[in-house]
UniProtKB/Swiss-Prot annotation:
One of its GO terms (biological process) is potassium ion transport. Keywords: Cell membrane, Membrane, Repeat, Transmembrane, Transmembrane helix, Transport. GO terms for cellular component: plasma membrane. Belongs to the AAE transporter (TC 2.A.81) family. The lineage of its organism: Bacteria, Pseudomonadati, Pseudomonadota, Gammaproteobacteria, Alteromonadales. PROSITE patterns: RCK_C (PS51202). This is Uncharacterized transporter SO_2143. It is a multi-pass membrane protein. It comes from the Bacteria. Residues 204-288, 290-377 form the RCK C-terminal domain. InterPro entries: AAE_transporter, Asp_Ala_antiprt, RCK_C, RCK_C_sf, YidE_YbjL.
Length: 562
């Protein structure tokens, strides 16, 4: 044991990786559906390892924290800007109000309990499950120019307060949002989602049509077939809730170019793409059509791609509006993903598309290539990263954040951390217009998000290790009880405001609350309770605004309390 202690003291970098190894391994274990998660497990592992009195350079913590904050900003840029634009403004304003509750109640609880700045910073981060705020709070405390011993004591209790309150902050938030609040507000989530679908043009038949396997068949029309005499547009209009398109036409023995006004005649052979059971419903009399194998009409390549939306003309349009255009002909929309968590958005006629959305499309290659040019660009997820863009963004953000302005004796600064977060937002938003540069692969964003944060957490835990037990004794068991209060009340008041002031539909209300508190685990439980992903419609904008504000609150609460 002495050998291990001495080795870790000489090579503190080993202690960091040991904390990560234990943290990720333990954090991924589940017991009856509950897991600590990598962040909490890494912190606890680091605290235990920190009992060896290991000295770790603060630069390690700072470098990885800046990487993490850039990834946070980069992931939510388009959604954040969308949130403060016209279409997302109600949800963005709600997120601001919810975040104010998340700031107010922890401060009140901490004041009543008599916690110092360090304990309050950790208490806020744990109860609101926003680990990133600890970094900004730490920077703010550093700029207060307090005596070294007092600052050291504050830094040592931050992880104590965080670790004790984070567990209920995570699990409790999910239970409160998915179980307790629906009962208190008398919300039947499943019924609410069905009502939302009905009001926004969604039906069981419609949803089924969006996801059905694409098929391409050719039919020869006889004089008894209902399609004879119709234009192609009129034929396709026979399937208002089903995806069926004429993809080719052979007239008088020749394959000809078609448009919506082309007329169908007896003896024509048409290639029909879409749902096979829908074909059968229309061509319901065997003597009125012959299914043929016209190889020239059927030999058309099918393509499935992910498209990154960048078009100004598409931004904010509903699927119903886009579906009325001729450009949507032959296109099957399989999936909509939005935000840094790639939240899957329900496909409904009134669902709006925004820049930064990723659409999974399928259809004939000619149709997919045509519509891709109008929507944006194919989301080509290469392995190489634009490192120059990434590093330059961090430099610009850190330089701006390093500026300090004093009002009396009070220093006002974004800090390098806050500056990098904002730089990530801005650079990501710019990239949504020009996706040809600044590409950071999704696995790399995950690495910076997860490992960047956990190295920072490990550094905090290792440094606080020697004083952790003393800090826990000082704060006592009441810290956990105060944490329950500070976690629950902001969620309850946010739900009340969302229902009675913003008048959100019950189907998306709890998704808005989960987003404003950046608790993805809660969204999963809410969707499971609702048996639908409709609540996800309230998550992405509020998550973008909430993630930004809750992180910045780490700085703000120190300024308020001083």
């Amino acid at each position: 044991m002495n050998w291990l202690k001495t080795t870790l003291q000489i090579y503190p970098e080993i202690a960091v990786f040991l904390s990560l190894a234990i943290g990720y391994w333990v954090g991924n274990k589940t017991f009856k559906g509950f897991s600590l998660g990598a962040v909490t497990a890494t912190l606890l592992a680091a605290v235990v390892i920190g009992q060896f009195d290991i000295t770790l350079s603060s630069n390690v913590k700072s470098i990885f924290f800046l990487m993490f904050l850039f990834a946070v900003g980069y992931g939510i840029g388009p959604q954040f800007v969308q949130g403060i634009a016209k279409d997302g403004l109600p949800q963005a304003l709600f997120a601001v109000v919810a975040c104010l509750f998340s700031l107010l109640f922890p401060i009140l609880c901490a004041k009543i309990a008599g916690y110092d700045l360090g304990a309050t910073a950790g208490f806020f981060a744990g109860t609101q499950t926003i680990s990133a705020s600890m970094g900004l709070a730490t920077d703010a405390i550093v700029h207060l120019d307090l005596p070294a011993e007092e600052s050291k004591k504050m830094f040592s209790v931050i992880p104590v307060a965080y670790a004790v309150t984070y567990i209920f902050g995570t699990v409790g938030s999910a239970i409160v949002l998915a179980q307790i609040i629906p009962k208190l507000l008398r919300i039947d989530l499943e019924a609410a989602c069905k009502d939302y679908m009905a009001k926004n043009g969604g039906t069981t038949e419609n949803a089924r049509g969006e996801w059905h396997t694409y098929a391409l068949r050719s039919y020869k029309l006889t004089e008894k077939n209902r399609a004879v005499g119709m234009t192609i547009h009129e034929f396709e209009a026979q399937f208002p809730h089903r995806k069926v398109f004429v993809e080719g036409l052979r007239h008088e023995g020749k394959v000809i170019d078609t448009d919506p006004n082309s007329k169908l005649s007896t003896g024509d052979i048409i290639a029909v793409g879409g749902e096979y059971d829908a074909f059968v419903e229309f061509f319901d009399h065997p003597d009125s059509f012959d299914e043929t194998q016209d190889s020239e009409l059927l030999n058309q390549p099918v393509l499935g791609v992910d498209v990154y939306v960048t078009s100004r003309g598409i931004n904010g349009k509903t699927l119903a509006e886009l579906g009325k255009t001729t450009s949507s002909h032959g296109i099957f929309l399989r999936k909509i993903k939005r935000g840094p968590k790639a939240i899957e958005i329900p496909i409904l006629p009134q669902t709006r598309l925004f820049r930064g959305d990723i659409l999974t499309l399928s259809g004939l290659t000619k149709d997919v290539e045509r519509v891709t040019k109008q929507l944006g660009v194919i989301d080509q997820r290469g392995n190489s990263m634009d490192v120059a863009f990434w590093a330059f963004a961090i430099v610009i953000g850190a330089l701006l954040g390093s500026l300090v302005f004093k009002i009396g004796n009070l220093p006002l600064t974004l800090s390098t951390a806050g500056g990098v977060l904002i730089a990530g937002l801005i650079f990501s938003w710019v990239r949504s217009f020009h996706p040809t540069f600044g590409w950071v692969p999704e696995p790399t964003v995950w690495f910076m998000n997860s490992v960047g944060l956990n190295v920072f957490i490990a550094a905090i835990g290792i440094s606080a290790g020697p004083n952790f037990v003393a800090g826990l004794k000082e704060l006592g068991f009441s810290l956990f009880l105060w944490g329950v209060v500070a976690t629950t009340l902001p969620l309850f008041f946010a739900a009340l405001v969302g229902k009675y002031v913003f008048k959100f539909h019950p189907a998306i209300l709890l998704g808005c609350c989960a987003g404003a508190r950046t608790t993805t685990a809660s969204l999963g439980m809410i969707n499971e309770k609702a048996k639908s992903n409709i609540p996800s419609l309230g998550y992405t904008i509020t998550y973008a605004v909430g993630n930004t504000l809750l992180t910045m609150w780490g700085l703000v609460l120190i300024l308020i309390l001083t």
